[in-house]
Amino acid sequence: MGQEKVTVSTRPLQWKCVESRADSKRLYYGRFLLAPLMRGQADTIGIAMRRALLGEIEGTCITRAKSEKIPHEYSTIVGIQESVHEILMNLKEIVLRSNLYGTRDASICVKGPGYVTAQDIILPPSVEIVDNTQHIANLTEPITLCIELQIERNRGYRIKTPNNFQNGSYPIDAVFMPVRNANHSIHSYVNGNENQEILFLEIWTNGSLTPKEALHEASRNLIDLFIPFFHAEEHLENNQHKGTLPLFNFHGRLAKPRKTKKEIALKYIYIDQSELPPRVYNCLKRSNINTFLELLNNSQEELMKIQDFRIEDVKHILDVLEI
């Protein structure tokens, strides 16, 4: 823990952790370097890594809560200091670590008076709490508070919608991203007759992953995205004589089926890697559209049925894809 003196060898390319610390159970910091890089490479890698760190790494959150004592989200319960809304906000802040897939059930059942904290959550075996001291509620009277919880592993974030209330349960805004922030900076220097660069990456996490683990996972995700390009030519040769269905079926420019490298690559390009406006991105994520291939397999009419999606958004998507 602490800062090391940075020394860079001109060859070969190397990476190093130059600073690492835990500011709290829910705030880790790491600083890394990669060098030597040719001019322009540091920015290319830095931008890609930042996007992968913030958008491609999965995390685990509480996404839904249910209790018979809750008439509606903005109600209060006798014997509990916090309102229902405040309890839901406290549940949103709970940081979990897991390797689960899909959703799991958890629960809280505590008799007052006393404080309810994260350590009172009864979790499935595959899930653990990063900070057991996180506050949930204060029971001021001898009442019993029982809450059923839903835990989910995903990536990005999900904003609750008014029509997402089911059987007296309440959705919770989910921020799945274990990386709180990521920045990159570049140090340029001259080595002989060459202009070279050092890339510095700064990563802050919520404690469910260390910055080093986040860096490794983001790197793996980027590699997985690029691997298909190595096989694209072979894939095209094997399929050039086969009949195919139209890949794009909205907008006149996309009416004819075309098996190009770009179209094949769309399967592996996620919408959060693009420059889509936040409103358009949220519309698509709510409709479970994660990749551009999934997006373009919808007709324009189907897209227009998505809540808050507008006709001009179609043109914006086409401009982003440059098709």
Swiss-Prot record:
Pfam families: RNA_pol_A_bac, RNA_pol_A_CTD, RNA_pol_L. DNA-dependent RNA polymerase catalyzes the transcription of DNA into RNA using the four ribonucleoside triphosphates as substrates. This is DNA-directed RNA polymerase subunit alpha. GO terms for molecular function: DNA binding; DNA-directed RNA polymerase activity; protein dimerization activity. In plastids the minimal PEP RNA polymerase catalytic core is composed of four subunits: alpha, beta, beta', and beta''. When a (nuclear-encoded) sigma factor is associated with the core the holoenzyme is formed, which can initiate transcription. The N-terminal domain is essential for RNAP assembly and basal transcription, whereas the C-terminal domain is involved in interaction with transcriptional regulators and with upstream promoter elements. It comes from Morus indica (Mulberry). Belongs to the RNA polymerase alpha chain family.
